[in-house]
Amino acid sequence: MANNYTYGIIGAMDNEIDTLVGDLENKKEEKKYGLTFYLGKLKKYDVVIVKCGIGKVNAGRTTQVLISEYSPKYIINTGIAGGLNQQLNIGDIVISTDLIQYDFDVTAFGYAKGYMFIGDKKEPTKYMADKDLTEKMKK
């Protein structure tokens, strides 16, 4: 198991990772659990790139395999976003500061959209992004 990867990069579709995979130096390919991982260097960083397939379940499964097998310090999801804001154009880079479960709705029970319950623990409506990583991405 390798533990020296700074970034794990996940994309849902081939066209979301192809350019990054093509730019890898010292590229190595590994197949695990039905997934193909591309290892190498992007600029000065050791990275592992993987296509997860579309959907939250595929993303979650692939993220767990990525963590278990390669232990990246940071995980980045790259890809195509839907038309959320008319001020955004193709090629724009969006860096999130927080996220919600957009498709999880318990408002009928008096809670905010995205509010989560896991066991007896109440989860926050918003999950905050890592501030250090957010700042690095802006550079």
Set out the residue ranges of the language-model regions.
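Glycine-rich phosphate- or other oxyanion-binding loops that anchor nucleotides, phosphorylated ligands
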Residues: A2-T6, K31-K139
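Short, conserved "active-site rim" segments that organize catalytic pockets and cofactor/ligand binding
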Residues: N4-L24, D46
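Short glycine-aromatic motifs
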Residues: D23-K31
